[in-house]
């Protein structure tokens, strides 16, 4: 257990490849999304990585990770959020520094948030064209009831209403 309360595990790679994989799981998730702000955790999780950091705009972060041949992804789920990092062992120091910066100093760039919202709105419009999507929604409603977070899907109004300030406030709760 680290000083800040985070539980960390180190597992050796049996393949002996010169690769390092890191996974960070964060307690919290969509169950924290206020009514009317459904999709907040999902937006926050995506924008941690996609929105750059205070010292590295998104394009520079992308370029640096590309140069290192590293994969760094973040997500926000129903009950947890997290980060995945995969890179060469020789680059682990810089990769960990970038991962820490992404987690602790996100910029949540407005242009990247706007793009994410447009993409999510398009996906929402297509939801009724996908039987599997309808099924996931209905199973959540039938299993948990309409007021349970796992059954609450983002509406167009909720997605359009998400702001950079919402992401910053959510970040303060999550990290």
What do the PLM-derived regions correspond to, one by one?
Residues 107-108, 113, 162-164, 170:
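Peptidyl-prolyl cis-trans isomerase
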């Amino acid at each position: 257990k680290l000083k800040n309360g985070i539980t960390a595990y180190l597992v050796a790679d049996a393949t002996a490849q010169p690769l390092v994989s890191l996974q960070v799981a964060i307690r919290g998730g969509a169950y924290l999304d206020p009514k009317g702000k459904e999709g907040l955790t999902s937006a926050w999780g995506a924008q941690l990585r996609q929105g750059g950091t205070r010292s590295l705009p998104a394009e520079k972060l992308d370029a640096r990770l590309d140069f290192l041949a590293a994969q760094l992804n973040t997500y926000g789920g129903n009950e947890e959020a997290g980060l995945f990092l995969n890179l060469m062992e020789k680059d682990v120091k810089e990769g960990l520094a970038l991962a820490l910066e992404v987690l602790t100093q996100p910029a949540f760039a407005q242009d990247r948030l706007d793009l994410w919202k447009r993409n999510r709105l398009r996906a929402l419009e297509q939801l009724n064209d996908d039987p599997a999507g309808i099924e996931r929604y209905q199973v959540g409603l039938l299993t948990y009831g309409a007021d349970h977070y796992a059954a609450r899907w983002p509406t167009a109004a909720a997605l359009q209403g998400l702001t950079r300030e919402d992401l910053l406030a959510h970040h303060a709760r999550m990290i």
